[in-house]
Amino acid sequence: GVYIFFSLLVPCTTNEPQLQQIILEKDSDVDSLKNIIYCLKEENYFLYQTMDSLPLGSPLDTLVLSSKFGWRKKPFGGGWQKHTGTDFLAAWHDTVYATGNGKVIKSGWNVGYGRQIKISHCGGYESTYAHLYRLFVRNGDSVILGQPIGRAGNSGVVTGPHLHYEILRNDKKT
């Protein structure tokens, strides 16, 4: 430490209490700075971990919107319905990616959505991927941002192959 460095240059004796006090204060300042640097590194790491855990990534290599979130004409039977996600054009078997780090809480069949994957992310967020042809992950699996999780398809109630994508926050579709 700094104390040892200075003690090699200027021997400390009981006759030099002021010098000893200065050295102790400098050691304390260095320790404080080290602690601040450590805390900043930890906060920065936490920020990056949090950002990767939010569903902010792209679920497909190319995003072409085919149906937006909100009210739309029903594809079957006429009338209007609230569309609770976003549909993206996808060719049969296009790779579908996790949009953030998380844990798979559903990987399986849903009557309307067909083959579906739901991932729980930090902060109460969940992402849902529906109408898949193939599922690469199982319930309980951990996934990372950009990891392939399945293949696009036309399972469930659909007019053709596409990816239905949803983001939920605290169980509310957004």
Predicted regions span which residues?
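Bacterial Sec-dependent signal peptides at the C-terminal "C-region" and cleavage site
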Residues: 1-21
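Intrinsic structural disorder/low-complexity segments
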Residues: 21-24, 124, 134, 167
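Surface-exposed, glycine-biased beta-strand/turn segments
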Residues: 21-115, 145
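Conserved, short, structured surface segments that act as functional micro-motifs
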Residues: 65, 115-121, 128, 139-174
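Residue-level recognition of beta-strand microenvironments
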Residues: 68, 107-108, 135, 152-155
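Active-site acidic-Proline motif in GNAT/NAT acetyltransferases
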Residues: 90, 135, 139
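Zn2+-dependent peptidoglycan hydrolase active-site motif and core
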Residues: 98-136, 161
